Amino acid sequence: MNAPSVRAPLAERALSERVRAVPPSGIRKFFDILATMEDVISLGVGEPDFDTPRHIVEAGVESLREGRTHYTSNYGTVELRRALARHLLGRYGVEYDPATELLITVGASEAVDLALRATCDPGDEVILHEPSYVAYVPAIVFAGGRAVHVPTRFEDDFALDPAAVEAAITPRTKALFLGYPCNPTGAVLTPAIQDALAEIAVRHDLLVYSDEIYDRLAYGSYTHRAFSSLPGMRERTILMGGFSKAYAMTGWRVGWLAAPAGILEGIVKVHQYGIMSAPTIAQDAALVALVEGEADVERMRAEYDRRRRLVVDGFNEMGLETFEPRGAFYAFPRITSTGLDAETFARRLLEEEHVAVVPGGAFGPSGEGHVRACYATSYEQLEEALVRIGRFVGRCRAEAAARP
């Protein structure tokens, strides 16, 4: 009589291969440690330190008072979609039909998830620059796709090389995924690179996913262009964005997605069976943000710019070479001169000086040797964080010099 086969515990067998293939977030474990500590300055979470502007909050409160506590259309409120259409036309010169080409989502994260799940078939390859936001690869995997990385390097200002993108294309390539301005590097796409990527997308008949959540946070001479506004790109681009970063509305969870009607119709299928609609009161607040919040955006952007200069100068002065970010609100200093790898650097900095940063490897293999520091916290806290980091870097170098 054959012995019964030994099966793995149900908890292990219950999870799908896709879920098991994705490791836990490289960021989360540091925040689990951080939660147990006091006097910590966190440069880890990518969240504005500003509260949502008062008039936007009041719009949400008024929405509640008016009893707007029911579902909206799957697509979102008509008023918000119309305002978004005007915004995209006025700022980027790209026209969308608010009835059939715009979708309001639960944050830009849902937009990314929807876009991928609605368009990826098993085994489809999606070309993705890296370092890049930690959620992109899992979203591709959960959709059944395969991420194909194109590394970017500090020595090249983390610029995406169109020739490298084209070299990565195979018969299985479905799409190109762009997340610019870039989290974690702060890099942007120059007009020349954008144009070259657009030509590649047309030449190889690729879909383009473009997450532009940081579009309003650009510095210096850089001016953002929506990828769908480029020649030939509107019909093949799924454009995504949201209100969290520019308007300090992370907790409201409102994003958006713009795509040709034929593509959006399929995306809405995924949305309506999973989410139904974004929260009504949050959409009402987002409408006021979009229509009346320009001064708020500029006020916060100017302060981020002031902090950006402080942090970049501070890192460079302590010998941590740092690319000058042109967008978003992150610095990505190179820490190899300390003799530590990025994970050890981040762990020890948290334990010894109570400053939280994120190891660069969490954003892809070419992020190793760097850490991400978010400067969306107060100027005074950033000044203190730089003092602590400088002290820690000095100790690390002294330790390295003392080794035989």
Could you say what each language-model-derived stretch is?
Residues 1-15, 20-23, 33-37, 41, ...:
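PLP-dependent class I/II
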Residues 30, 63-87, 91-92:
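N-terminal Rossmann-like NAD(P)+-binding subdomain of aldehyde/semialdehyde dehydrogenases
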